[in-house]
């Protein structure tokens, strides 16, 4: 089944005003196609939203992230992708790793890192005046940016300590692995580029959508708690992010947009 085949899938009707008002940044409640138009009108008339929220909600209704993630976060789905993308097994074999599907890897980051990354990426896209299509692409690409981690051994991904150079080289393959797996689903080439390039240095790519998700990804990772580190404040995170700009790892224009976003949207600050 292709990505477009599961857009808008849901069995939940969200029609009550109090339910509609709760469609704010979360990944829990969405309307099915029959009530989307009414829901848009309802939320737009009864809930005062900033542009970021509006774009994000339209993305939720169009793609239904829960449906997409649930569809692909099964061993059956990933094994089918592996059959259609044998290069993934080759990539892992070159690192001495067996191709084992680790569903739990994605479940742990799905409602924290992924959600925050999507929110920040959409905010950046709005701040940088990107087109509606590009905003939708950024939301989709950032939603799946870490999908390749489904093939990374859990003991490496969640290691309570510094990774060895060998382990780091394995973890770093998740971008290419995610790209190869999702390429079999019919996802758009622009969204796939985000998945593949979100860890690539800004100086090594001209893809502005990937640069945006890179900044959102780094900010999200720094400001959340991980097995190997504590949560960092927005101020401390920005200090590190600024150093990455100096090193050519992150794009300066995107980081400037992030500073503006943090000043405008308190909900994005850690």
Feature-to-residue mapping (PLM):
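Intrinsically disordered, low-complexity segments enriched in small/polar and acidic residues
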Residues: 61, 269-270
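Alpha-helical scaffolding flanking metal-ion-dependent phosphate/phosphodiester catalytic sites
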Residues: 117, 137-153, 159, 163-255
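Short hydrophobic alpha-helical segments that form membrane-spanning helices or hydrophobic packing faces
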Residues: 256-260
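Non-Sec secretion/translocation targeting segments of pathogen effectors
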Residues: 1-30, 34-35, 39-45, 270
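Acidic/His-rich, divalent-metal-binding segments that scaffold phosphate/diphosphate chemistry
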Residues: 51-172, 182-185, 190
């Amino acid at each position: 089944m292709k990505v477009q085949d599961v857009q808008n899938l849901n069995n939940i009707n969200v029609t009550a005003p109090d339910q509609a008002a709760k469609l704010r940044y979360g990944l829990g409640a969405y309307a099915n196609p029959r009530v989307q138009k009414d829901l848009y009108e309802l939320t737009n008339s009864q809930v005062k939203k900033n542009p970021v929220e509006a774009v994000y909600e339209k993305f939720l209704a169009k793609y239904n992230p829960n449906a997409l993630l649930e569809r692909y976060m099964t061993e059956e789905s990933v094994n089918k992708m592996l059959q259609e993308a044998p290069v993934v097994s080759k990539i892992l074999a070159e690192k001495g790793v067996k191709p084992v599907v680790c569903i739990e890897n994605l479940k742990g980051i799905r409602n924290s890192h992924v959600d925050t990354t999507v929110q920040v990426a959409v905010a950046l896209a709005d701040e940088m005046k990107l087109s509606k299509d590009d905003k939708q692409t950024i939301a989709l690409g950032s939603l799946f940016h870490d999908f390749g981690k489904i093939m990374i051994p859990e003991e490496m991904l969640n290691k309570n300590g510094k990774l060895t150079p060998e382990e780091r080289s394995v973890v770093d393959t998740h971008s290419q692995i995610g790209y190869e797996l999702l390429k079999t689903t019919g996802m758009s080439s622009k969204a796939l580029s985000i998945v593949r390039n979100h860890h690539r240095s800004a100086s090594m790519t001209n893809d502005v959508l990937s640069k945006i998700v890179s900044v959102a990804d780094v900010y999200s990772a720094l400001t959340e708690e991980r097995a190997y580190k504590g949560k960092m404040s927005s101020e401390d995170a920005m200090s590190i992010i600024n150093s990455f700009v100096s090193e050519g790892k992150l794009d300066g224009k995107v980081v400037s947009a992030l500073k503006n976003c943090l000043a405008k949207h308190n909900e994005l600050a850690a």
